[in-house]
Swiss-Prot record:
Keywords: Chemotaxis, Cytokine, Disulfide bond, Glycoprotein, Inflammatory response, Secreted, Signal. The gene is CCL24. GO terms for biological process: antimicrobial humoral immune response mediated by antimicrobial peptide; chemokine-mediated signaling pathway; eosinophil chemotaxis; inflammatory response; positive regulation of cell migration. The lineage of its organism: Eukaryota, Metazoa, Chordata, Craniata, Vertebrata. One of its GO terms (molecular function) is CCR chemokine receptor binding. Disulfide bonds join 33-58, 34-74. This is C-C motif chemokine 24. Belongs to the intercrine beta (chemokine CC) family. Chemotactic for resting T-lymphocytes, and eosinophils. Has lower chemotactic activity for neutrophils but none for monocytes and activated lymphocytes. Is a strong suppressor of colony formation by a multipotential hematopoietic progenitor cell line. Binds to CCR3. Glycans are attached at residues 54, 115.
Amino acid sequence: MAGLATFVVSLLLVTLCAHCIDPAGSVSIPSSCCMFFISKKVPENRVVTYQLLNGSVCPKAGVVFTTKKNQKFCGDPQLHWVQKLMKNIEARRKKVSPGVRAMSTKALVQRYPANSTSI
């Protein structure tokens, strides 16, 4: 009976130790990394933004695109259509930015026309 109890306790200790020890060289991959790339071209008007993930954090470099419906998919940054889509999104972003600034300045000027005094 003592032999059986010793065996059970030993087995329990080995099982606990096996779960506590982290194997050497284990790598945790962030959930935001691209593991698979979409194979077909996505219409440009559906995509609103992108995030470039380099190979230093993730095993594969990839581009995470976000659609208007907040769906995310990965593109291979080596593909021509992915590079073109990134460039077009940047162009849209730069095109919108100056207009937004100009409109906000114009709105401030129109909002307070009584600030100037005339003699």
